[in-house]
């Protein structure tokens, strides 16, 4: 029983409550990947239909509607995306980009990139 109680704070951090909206306040660094055409038309966690050609992304915790600048740390290329989907916390990715955003970053071939996320101006 005690072990279960000790695990609860960890679960609260791993899975933000509905209504809890952690914002991008500072720089975040991690791995970006992208999800492609097979998801076209499927509903995202925000309820919108996935459009591979829109500049959108999935995040484990950022609020829907957040605008973030994603910059490839190797090349310096960047793109601004809107968060409209969720990534499971066990996914070990910082962000999952649409095809259009991945193309703009130049990561379609390798599929992943080491990136920095910062709030986009006007976000």
Positions of the model-derived regions?
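Secreted/periplasmic proteins
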Residues: 2-123
């Amino acid at each position: 029983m005690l072990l279960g109680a000790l695990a609860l704070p960890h679960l609260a951090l791993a899975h933000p409550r509905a209504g809890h909206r952690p914002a991008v306040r500072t720089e975040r660094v991690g791995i970006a990947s992208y999800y492609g055409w097979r998801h076209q038309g499927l509903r995202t966690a925000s309820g919108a239909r996935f459009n591979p050609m829109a500049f959108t992304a999935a995040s484990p915790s950022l609020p829907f509607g957040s605008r973030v600048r994603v910059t490839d740390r190797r090349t310096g290329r960047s793109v601004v995306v809107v968060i409209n989907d969720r990534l499971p916390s066990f996914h070990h990715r910082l962000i999952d980009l649409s095809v259009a955003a991945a193309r703009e970053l130049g990561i379609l071939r390798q599929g992943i990139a080491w990136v920095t996320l910062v709030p986009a101006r006007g976000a």
